[in-house]
Amino acid sequence: MKNLSAYEVYESPKTSGESRTEAVSEAAFESDPEVSAILVLTSSEASTLERVADLVTAHALYAAHDFCAQAQLAAAELPSRVVARLQEFAWGDMNEGHLLIKGLPQVRSLPPTPTSNVHAVAATTPMSRYQALINECVGRMIAYEAEGHGHTFQDMVPSAMSAHSQTSLGSAVELELHTEQAFSPLRPDFVSLACLRGDPRALTYLFSARQLVATLTTQEIAMLREPMWTTTVDESFLAEGRTFLLGFERGPIPILSGADDDPFIVFDQDLMRGISAPAQELQQTVIRAYYAERVSHCLAPGEMLLIDNRRAVHGRSIFAPRFDGADRFLSRSFIVADGSRSRHARSSFGRVVSARFS
């Protein structure tokens, strides 16, 4: 496993006034293939981002469409170098499935880390505007009624009640490799993670379809392009007894698709099952390749990670939250390249995909 980050230790205040040791990741990919996957903002670019964010005045939670539309317009004011790099990533031909952005303005007066994802705390911070401006350079922001309460920005925080779950609220078990919403034809094209508070033990794992293909035989690649796997709906979508137009079990579907030199991947270690013994064994081959070749990064405050949900899978390590108000706190949002693909599942001028269409 390659590690994308080096660490330096610093002391950050607890909400109680005590101190706690955390780690900050520095801009240091350890091998050349990942170097192009980092965008480091200069101090001038960060200042411009902070200034442009003031143009976004709508409420991120209660006026989500207006908020996103304002961010789309304001994004034209961002530095051309930043916009060009984000658009290059969005186009995708040369991306490795992720882009790490460093040097975002630090959020002052950050509220305590919430203990659940109910209250959309991240949406009330300046980070939501920074994140939206960057997101809207890549595509159009979208939300899902059945995921994170339909919030445009979801609080990714550890929950004591969900510590052992295969969801973003877990911490006591490794979050296994997955495509975000692998089961849904309306899944996001990109996942956006902005760090408000970090944890040195919480690593985000990344593994691209290109990395996978490089480990496989021609026969294995051909098999992965056949519809030989089923998947079920994610646990986080099943609250409130929801039903779905496509049912609970989906497929069979292929794991790989797209161009030979730019493959797409759909995978979920927890939810996918092969329809035959060879398919099940090949699924295990994919998992073994992930553990051997994945890269990792420890997100720190002022960093944002964009994941191309078509070209890469991701996961997260085990970590040990204290539930003291100073735990890991990420803001997650979703982006699509083409908003019209989900228009039938959203209300007029709405940004939220209705649960039954997921």
Swiss-Prot record:
It catalyses: L-lysine + 2-oxoglutarate + O2 = (3S)-3-hydroxy-L-lysine + succinate + CO2. The keyword Oxidoreductase applies. Fe cation binds at H178, E180, H314. The keyword Transport does not apply. Its cofactor is Fe(2+). Its EC number is 1.14.11.-. GO terms for molecular function: 2-oxoglutarate-dependent dioxygenase activity; iron ion binding. Being totally regio- and stereoselective, this enzyme is of interest for biocatalytic purposes to produce chiral scaffolds that are of synthetic value in the preparation of more complex functionalized chiral molecules such as natural products and analogs. Binds 1 Fe(2+) ion per subunit. 2-oxoglutarate binds at R328. InterPro entries: Clavaminate_syn-like, TauD-like_sf. Keywords: Dioxygenase, Iron, Metal-binding, Oxidoreductase. It is an enzyme of class 1 (oxidoreductase). Belongs to the clavaminate synthase family. Alpha-ketoglutarate-dependent dioxygenase that in vitro catalyzes the regio- and stereoselective hydroxylation of L-lysine, leading to (3S)-3-hydroxy-L-lysine. Can also use (5R)-5-hydroxy-L-lysine as substrate, but neither D-lysine nor L-ornithine. This is L-lysine 3-hydroxylase. It comes from Catenulispora acidiphila (strain DSM 44928 / JCM 14897 / NBRC 102108 / NRRL B-24433 / ID139908). The lineage of its organism: Bacteria, Bacillati, Actinomycetota, Actinomycetes, Catenulisporales.
